[in-house]
Amino acid sequence: MFRHVIATISVAALTPIATALGACDASEHRQFDFWLGQWNVRTPDGKLAGTNSISSEYGGCVLHERYSTGRDYSGESLNMFDATRKVWHQTWVDTSGALLLLEGGLSGHSMVLEGQTVGADGQATKHRITWTPNVDGSVRQHWESTDSKGQWRTAFDGMYTKQ
């Protein structure tokens, strides 16, 4: 009897570890992998906006973004698929003190994440960022935000090419 209890406790104790080992193996966790790599980011006129490094971390559960303009601005994001809610999440922080929380998922072949910030004046701004993989291996990032009248405007349009 005692051995049976010990065996049951041992199996129960190992179950979370076994579950955690395969926690991010589902195909949904790979939906944003097209963004992985070392990138040069250019504006539509071809000027270098910055560089971006996207790595897979924490056993493939997290995409870690490190963006730099090479000047006074840089930022990082953590991206993950929340399997419980079936949604992608991004937390962005940068040298301007900004915090941007986005959520969404695949729309066709593009990753579309949306969120909202509130300015010091209490004005809410909606954000929508779309990453679209291209057949040549590049990725377009189109960031839109709403103006004071609620109209969508392009905040950033960048083309990612592998370094």
Give residue spans per PLM region.
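Positively charged n-region of N-terminal signal peptides that target proteins for export
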Residues: M1-H4
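Hydrophobic small-molecule pocket/channel-lining residues, especially in calycin-type beta-barrels
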Residues: A20-Q163
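Bacterial N-terminal signal peptides
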Residues: A7-P16
